[in-house]
């Protein structure tokens, strides 16, 4: 059986309660509520005072017992003081029981108080919780991202290239619907690199086609990021916007496409310049002489009269020019020519010893032919 007795004494007013015609019902309810709130506040205040008094009394009892114990343990403690503390402890325990009784009476009184509109119910929840998508975990390391990209490309490179060659919106949407795994960052990264490769190879028309598909994938990824959803769940929304001729969206797409193509051209130019520098450095290293000097650089650093001697390949003319120069300068320039491999002592005569420094009076030198785009200045 359900006990309904708890409902017998509820201090609430019904809107249908009869009141005197000269009494405003709303005001009457307001006065009753105010009086009820004041009674509740007074009751709560008395309860808090009793609680504080009880705690203070318990603290005094504990303090008195501590002093009593210390005095009993101490040798030569005063008997008079001991008796006084015992009497005080006994009195405090009586007060403690009195406070506890008052608190118990207060609890009973609170339990028997009639319910009202303010105490009928209590908040079950003070806040609402909504499940949200967890924040993306910390980005993987550079090596992990590179490995992920490499694995993805090895598996789907053919499909990515097929997507990059598509022209029509409908074809792109259908292909992504059939190969939804392509809607990801790895596809976009591969298309970007492919665009740069095509520009380096001077396949400009094909680069512009692939650049268009690259921006399609980039816009899908940006849309997913703004909606905070998986790109595979929103790529159809991108095509819907584009195909319904959303003018502002289309203009934004075209602007980003042109900016992307300019960036691709810039990156391709930098790559070509870097490759040229690397090639030139390799060629320079190949032509370094036995002393580690570049013959082209040495030739360009020679005085004009010595350069003419190399241009006409005339040994006698070179010896005459050297004899007219300052001996120190002549020795410096000829030693650089030998270290660069531009000239070597005449091995046929055997008169020039290996490793001997060349000077103005060294007549036994022969030109060494140079390969490639270097000047052929052999005697």
From Swiss-Prot:
Phosphothreonine: modified positions: 119
GO annotation, biological process: positive regulation of type 2 mitophagy; post-transcriptional regulation of gene expression; protein folding; protein stabilization; regulation of type I interferon-mediated signaling pathway; regulation of type II interferon-mediated signaling pathway
UniProt-annotated location(s): Cytoplasm
Region spans: Disordered: 123-146, 344-379
Modified residues (Phosphoserine): 13, 121, 378
Residues with the N-acetylvaline modification: 2
Modified residues (N-acetylmethionine): 1
Principal cellular location given in the protein's record: cytoplasm
Keyword Acetylation among record annotations: yes
Keywords assigned by UniProt, alphabetized: Acetylation, Chaperone, Cytoplasm, Phosphoprotein, Ubl conjugation
Signal peptide limits: none
Gene Ontology annotations for the cellular component aspect, listed alphabetically: cytoplasm; cytosol; HSP90-CDC37 chaperone complex; protein folding chaperone complex; protein-containing complex; ruffle membrane
Post-translational modification remark: Constitutively sumoylated by UBE2I.
Record PTM N6-acetyllysine, positions in chain: 155
Domain of life: Eukaryota
GO MF term list: heat shock protein binding; Hsp90 protein binding; kinase binding; mitogen-activated protein kinase kinase kinase binding; protein kinase B binding; protein kinase binding; protein-folding chaperone binding; scaffold protein binding
Assembly notes: Probably forms a complex composed of chaperones HSP90 and HSP70, co-chaperones STIP1/HOP, CDC37, PPP5C, PTGES3/p23, TSC1 and client protein TSC2. Probably forms a complex composed of chaperones HSP90 and HSP70, co-chaperones CDC37, PPP5C, TSC1 and client protein TSC2, CDK4, AKT, RAF1 and NR3C1; this complex does not contain co-chaperones STIP1/HOP and PTGES3/p23. Forms a complex with Hsp90/HSP90AB1 and CDK6. Interacts with HSP90AA1. Interacts with AR, CDK4, CDK6 and EIF2AK1. Interacts with RB1. Interacts with KSR1. Interacts with FLCN, FNIP1 and FNIP2.
PANTHER family the UniProt entry points to: CDC37-RELATED (PTHR12800), HSP90 CO-CHAPERONE CDC37 (PTHR12800:SF3)
Record family assignment: Belongs to the CDC37 family.
Function description: Co-chaperone that binds to numerous kinases and promotes their interaction with the Hsp90 complex, resulting in stabilization and promotion of their activity. Inhibits HSP90AA1 ATPase activity.
Protein name per Swiss-Prot or TrEMBL: Hsp90 co-chaperone Cdc37
Organism: Rattus norvegicus
Encoding gene per record: Cdc37
């Amino acid at each position: 059986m359900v006990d309904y007795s708890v409902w017998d004494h509820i201090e609430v007013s019904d809107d249908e309660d009869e009141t005197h015609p000269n009494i405003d019902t709303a005001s009457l309810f307001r006065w009753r509520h105010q009086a009820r709130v004041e009674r509740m506040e007074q009751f709560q205040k008395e309860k808090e005072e009793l609680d504080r008094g009880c705690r203070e009394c318990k603290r005094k009892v504990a303090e008195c017992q501590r002093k009593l114990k210390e005095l009993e343990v101490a040798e030569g403690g005063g008997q008079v003081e001991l008796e006084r503390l015992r009497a005080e402890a006994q009195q405090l325990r009586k007060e403690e029981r009195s406070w506890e009784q008052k608190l118990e009476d207060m609890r009973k009184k609170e339990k028997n108080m009639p319910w009202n509109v303010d105490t009928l119910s209590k908040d079950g929840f003070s806040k609402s919780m909504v499940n949200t998508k967890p924040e993306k975990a910390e980005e993987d390391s550079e090596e992990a991202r590179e490995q992920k990209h490499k694995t993805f490309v090895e598996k789907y490179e053919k499909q990515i290239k097929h997507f990059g060659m598509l022209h029509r919106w409908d074809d792109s949407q259908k292909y992504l619907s059939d190969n939804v795994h392509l809607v990801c960052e790895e596809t976009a990264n591969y298309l970007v690199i492919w665009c740069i490769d095509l520009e380096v190879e001077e396949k400009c028309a094909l680069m512009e086609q692939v650049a268009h598909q690259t921006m399609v994938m980039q816009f899908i990824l940006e849309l997913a990021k703004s909606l905070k959803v998986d790109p595979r769940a929103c790529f159809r929304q991108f095509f819907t916007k584009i195909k319904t001729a959303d003018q502002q969206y289309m203009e934004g797409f075209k602007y980003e496409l042109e900016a992307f193509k300019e960036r691709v051209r810039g990156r391709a130019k930098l790559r070509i310049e870097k490759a040229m520098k690397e090639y030139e450095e390799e060629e320079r290293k190949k032509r370094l002489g036995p002393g580690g000097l570049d013959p082209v650089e040495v030739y360009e650093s020679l005085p004009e009269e010595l350069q003419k001697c190399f241009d006409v390949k005339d040994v006698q003319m070179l010896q005459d020019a050297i004899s007219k120069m300052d001996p120190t300068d002549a020795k410096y320039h000829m030693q650089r020519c030998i270290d660069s491999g531009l000239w070597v002592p005449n091995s046929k005569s055997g008169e020039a010893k290996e490793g001997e420094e060349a000077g103005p009076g060294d007549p036994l030198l022969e030109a060494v032919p140079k390969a490639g785009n270097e000047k052929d200045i052999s005697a």
